[in-house]
């Protein structure tokens, strides 16, 4: 896993009783196949390779093709964490950036993030679902009596959670009602806002853009600001109902982090945020 991987990845490995081999990323926060090879060396005990289809902290899409190649060489399971960013694949102009996703053994995407579905809507997709059924199917006389068809699809056999809601139904209704084009337009709006914010930060003498955004996340510095200044800035924006922002760290340094997702966020928010940083 990358040093930028979501905390839930390490937690899942801990539950499984597996140790994580943390692979350092460079200034661009992107996990690459080359970096994995360098970290693994001659080890032959690698079971899983996890890459991100849009990291949480920086919105970076890992080198999925390179990571998939290394996973195949190691005979390891290749999982892509696309909980936040994989939805951007709905945009034709973004699909090339996800080259390699087709080689994943499994991937995850959360419609409750960038598809605006109710909280808890999550899709875990397997290349070979029978492996998941073999792993997760629970048995008991009170359960087996319901299995009258060997080919019947039951989500409870594809994960460790037994009783569950039909959380995919609201996603289907939203897509059926609004259509894919409406979802594409909403996602694209977030990308446009991120690019405009990045350009404004890059043009300002008081701020420094850390990296060009790939998705809707923008990381930046403000000259002379430290942790306390970032905290006050975030609190003021929330108090004034301008925006809810949560500063983060980049390589241990407190920095600003903006995430653009809501399709009704006006373009004028860029000017408001810049005024709050320079006023």
Roles of regions detected by a PLM:
Residues 99-205, 212:
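Active-site C-terminal subdomain of aminotransferase-like
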Residues 208-237:
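Conserved PLP-binding catalytic core of the aspartate aminotransferase-like
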Residues 173-174, 219-221, 256-261:
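Short, hydrophobic beta-strand segments
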Residues 229-238, 270-278:
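Short amphipathic alpha-helices in soluble, non-transmembrane regions
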Residues 4-6, 27-28, 54-56, 85, ...:
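Short, glycine-/Ser/Thr-/acidic-enriched flexible segments
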Residues 212, 217, 240-257:
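Conserved PLP cofactor-binding pocket of PLP-dependent enzymes
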Residues 1-133:
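Conserved PLP-enzyme active-site core in the AAT-like
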Residues 74, 250-279:
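PLP-dependent enzyme catalytic core of the Aspartate aminotransferase-like
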């Amino acid at each position: 896993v990358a040093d930028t991987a979501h905390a839930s990845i390490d937690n899942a490995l801990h539950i499984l009783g597996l140790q994580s081999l943390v692979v350092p990323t460079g200034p661009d926060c992107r996990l690459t196949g080359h970096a994995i090879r360098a970290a693994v060396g001659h080890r032959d005990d690698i079971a899983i390779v996890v890459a991100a289809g849009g990291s949480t902290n920086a919105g970076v899409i890992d080198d999925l093709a390179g990571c998939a190649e290394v996973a195949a060489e190691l005979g390891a399971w290749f999982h892509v964490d696309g909980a936040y960013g994989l939805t951007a694949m709905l945009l034709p102009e973004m699909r090339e950036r996800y080259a390699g996703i087709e080689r994943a053994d499994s991937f995850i995407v959360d419609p409750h993030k960038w598809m605006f579905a109710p909280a808890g809507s999550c899709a875990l997709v397997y290349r070979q679902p029978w492996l998941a059924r073999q792993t997760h199917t629970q048995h008991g006389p009170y359960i087996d009596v319901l299995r009258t068809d060997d080919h019947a699809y039951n989500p409870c056999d594809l994960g460790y959670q037994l009783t569950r809601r039909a959380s995919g139904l609201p996603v289907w209704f939203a897509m059926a009602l609004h259509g894919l084009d409406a979802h594409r337009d909403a996602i694209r709006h977030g990308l446009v806002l991120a690019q405009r914010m990045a350009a404004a930060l890059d043009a300002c003498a008081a701020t420094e853009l850390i990296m060009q955004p790939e998705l809707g996340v923008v990381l930046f510095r403000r000259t002379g600001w430290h942790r306390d200044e970032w905290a006050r800035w975030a609190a003021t924006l929330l108090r004034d109902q301008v925006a809810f922002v949560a500063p983060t760290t980049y390589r241990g340094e407190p920095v600003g982090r903006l995430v653009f997702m809501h399709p009704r966020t006006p373009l004028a928010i860029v000017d408001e945020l810049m005024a709050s940083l320079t006023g």
